[in-house]
Amino acid sequence: CSLCSNSHSFTYSMVVENVLGITIPDRARYLRVIAEEIKRIASHLFNTAIQAHIIGFKSLFMHVMEVREMMQDLKETVYGNRMNLAANCIGGVKYNVDAELLEYMRKTLDKVEPQVDEIRDIYDTNSMVLARTRGLGLLPREDAIRLGVVGPVARGSGLRMDVRKDAPYA
């Protein structure tokens, strides 16, 4: 799907490079990780917005989508696409980041970070959110291990894991 599209070309490129013995430049590795992290933030914001919509918190849904839009604009500026980044290729990446683009990325993330902190605070403290989510969708730790879940689902089940750290891919 477009929410995780960069992950597909990222992993495909890594598999082919591994099979063919291709070592990519460090800069390309860093740029791949940057693309993946930008995509990940936008994807998590989208899922957070959908959760707000499902529990009937329309204003929070709109707010989170506005923050996500900043990430979508960032993706479009950096990669030329808002959804399917097409950032990776076998042997490297299809884009570069100059000082001006890097500054744009920093400024965007500096705007997004406090918004994400505010959204997190709403989810952690708002009585309506808590009333409509507390005790729902629980996945016991043992089931999470057995099912091999990762990411927010794993952390929500009490597993202190992050595949980016536990099994680095770049």
Per-region residue spans from a language model:
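Active-site bordering "gate/hinge" segments
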Residues: 1-170
